[in-house]
Amino acid sequence: MSAIENFDAHTPMMQQYLKLKAQHPEILLFYRMGDFYELFYDDAKRASQLLDISLTKRGASAGEPIPMAGIPYHAVENYLAKLVNQGESVAICEQIGDPATSKGPVERKVVRIVTPGTISDEALLQERQDNLLAAIWQDSKGFGYATLDISSGRFRLSEPADRETMAAELQRTNPAELLYAEDFAEMSLIEGRRGLRRRPLWEFEIDTARQQLNLQFGTRDLVGFGVENAPRGLCAAGCLLQYAKDTQRTTLPHIRSITMEREQDSIIMDAATRRNLEITQNLAGGAENTLASVLDCTVTPMGSRMLKRWLHMPVRDTRVLLERQQTIGALQDFTAELQPVLRQVGDLERILARLALRTARPRDLARMRHAFQQLPELRAQLETVDSAPVQALREKMGEFAELRDLLERAIIDTPPVLVRDGGVIASGYNEELDEWRALADGATDYLERLEVRERERTGLDTLKVGFNAVHGYYIQISRGQSHLAPINYMRRQTLKNAERYIIPELKEYEDKVLTSKGKALALEKQLYEELFDLLLPHLEALQQSASALAELDVLVNLAERAYTLNYTCPTFIDKPGIRITEGRHPVVEQVLNEPFIANPLNLSPQRRMLIITGPNMGGKSTYMRQTALIALMAYIGSYVPAQKVEIGPIDRIFTRVGAADDLASGRSTFMVEMTETANILHNATEYSLVLMDEIGRGTSTYDGLSLAWACAENLANKIKALTLFATHYFELTQLPEKMEGVANVHLDALEHGDTIAFMHSVQDGAASKSYGLAVAALAGVPKEVIKRARQKLRELESISPNAAATQVDGTQMSLLSVPEETSPAVEALENLDPDSLTPRQALEWIYRLKSLV
């Protein structure tokens, strides 16, 4: 900033500003001045554009007018929300000195830094979505990745082994803010992400990280957390924790542990799979018609966030899954009673985080009290549920009768938004506070008595006693009677139709009342802070309770969904395979206006791959996706949309379904498709579920068919993954004859003239035709074009009647082949006798042949 160059020429206040700004050069500085937060110089210019506020000038400092923009302090949350949503960070600078006793500028300091990944204020957060701060580290052995949800205290780390896994983690967690080292090599992995923050290398130093984490958790080592042997993850976690402390400017008592996320604990889904399955976000970027939109009828924001975490991280431990299934089954008869009570609990998880950060507002404490008031009824309802997991949740929930009583005594029923407004602490909680309030509140009676007395004494019927914020207490007399005012009345203010006066007695009372109001407010703030001190020792138990309540909300919700949507409980088996009877797509069945056609599926060690053929729009993609979604739902412990499901172990779910050009990276549709295919062929195992849709489009027919054949062969013979392979290459329907474990299925359609009816029903065997022209007609392609296409199709079929039976793995490759005419050069060579040529004739023949080619 050029203003710093001539620092001494500035006014004392601007010098103070410039010193503070120099400590936070990269971010906006909100500088408190009275009832406004002001921004100066480049900050003012940026803020005026980002917030659409006026850019003005403030006087001059160092001989130059100062660009300035300001926002009222009472509206700061709205403006912070706008900035955070745009990925900006803001340092909040408050007046901490007393203007009455300050010589020179009032003392100010930055009390907190608001960044996209470290916000905890209710107004700034999306209530049904996690808001994560993340850090990424890389060395020659792989990546380290850590995430922290400061609004709950949830702290995780992992060590993705390769670029694809790291990309999948970034997509799964979708951090609001991402810290990376200044020498980070894989910038293409993170560029374009919101909230990127470049950090110095020393912040990722391993010894510093261990020290920071041990200090935070009050431990001597990290063995108990299972992260001791995760150096890359610890480097990321250390940087992240330091950044959180720097921005919050306070201790973080709600962050009490760190958890290692291991690949083998959950079903791995890469970025393409999460996108294609539309788990929490549809392909257009919205939340409609996603799996979460169907499954999430939770009644608390913290329950909704937990369900989304489950959906993005299905667990492989069948003990956990069976426990969830048992709980859902046990709760099905109790959902109608439990959900209304759970709804009253609210977002206890985030309230506790604000309590830990000492930023909880009066209404947070009122909501906490309301949550505590629900616990006795919840516990009573759960007591009758015959389920050990439910009873374990009930115990973890606690009751907190003492804390409930404390908050009932301390906080009024409907407190104001801010403690600085006063009127938060209930009457009867503190005797001294009640005395100061009585003095302040007794003013009304006193003023009424004074008004009656002065009217009688002076005989002036227009005399009134009042108060305003600028001039304080006054006695008002109309202009017509003002000349009759007693001599001891001192003029305080002249109005158009009246005069206002003060008398020594009223002035003395005013000082007393204002002092009592100030004393009452100061004491109220002190008592409010003391409430934090009384609540914080119970923080760990309160966090466990919030976690149990969120889990109960998720499980009650899944029980309600299972009953309402006619889902069934899947059975887990030991061998790889998926057997589905009458399976349905959980999302499509909800948006259809007609009954959904349920379909079976059978994959087993003896039947590992299904080649799926049938018309476009016939339902191939729906059938494939519904299989993956049923598997995903089973592995979060949910019931599933089917009549019966048996499912074996799954380590990964892959989808190669649909593609679009990745223009930003300069990759064509075909390149995107091949990159995703390569990832599957490198990483799939016999326990993986693989969906492959239309491999080989975007290149020549022979290239595409050859690639599709080779991929299918590799998946069936070598990898032996559970595979659904949809294709338009009818040649692939010969695969079952050539290798074991492969079967044909098709989706049916009926054609009548130019019309087609899709049956959406899966049948064994290959499709008889693709119905491409009928689908084109349905799409509105002009009739003359369809007619010409039929004519051309008959021509091609007459030329190559066996096109559908082309042998891909042999030498015969006659797909749509046309008999070639004999070349003139070949004819000439066939009639040539080389032994009869002279050298000169031979040379002439070479030139003649050259002209024929």
Curated annotation (Swiss-Prot):
GO BP annotation list: mismatch repair
Residues that bind ATP: 614-621
InterPro entries per the UniProt record, alphabetical: DNA_mismatch_repair_MutS, DNA_mismatch_repair_MutS-lik_N, DNA_mismatch_repair_MutS/MSH, DNA_mismatch_repair_MutS_C, DNA_mismatch_repair_MutS_clamp, DNA_mismatch_repair_MutS_core, DNA_mismatch_repair_MutS_N, DNA_mismatch_repair_MutS_sf
Listed GO MF terms: ATP binding; ATP-dependent DNA damage sensor activity; damaged DNA binding; mismatched DNA binding
Keywords per UniProt: ATP-binding, DNA damage, DNA repair, DNA-binding, Nucleotide-binding
Record GO cellular component, one term: cytosol
HAMAP family linked to this entry: MutS (MF_00096)
The family this protein is said to belong to: Belongs to the DNA mismatch repair MutS family.
Known function: This protein is involved in the repair of mismatches in DNA. It is possible that it carries out the mismatch recognition step. This protein has a weak ATPase activity.
Record-linked PANTHER family: DNA MISMATCH REPAIR PROTEIN MSH1, MITOCHONDRIAL (PTHR11361:SF34), DNA MISMATCH REPAIR PROTEIN MUTS FAMILY MEMBER (PTHR11361)
NCBIfam families per the UniProt record, alphabetical: mutS1, PRK05399.1
The protein's name in its UniProt record: DNA mismatch repair protein MutS
Organism: Escherichia coli O157:H7
Gene for this chain: mutS
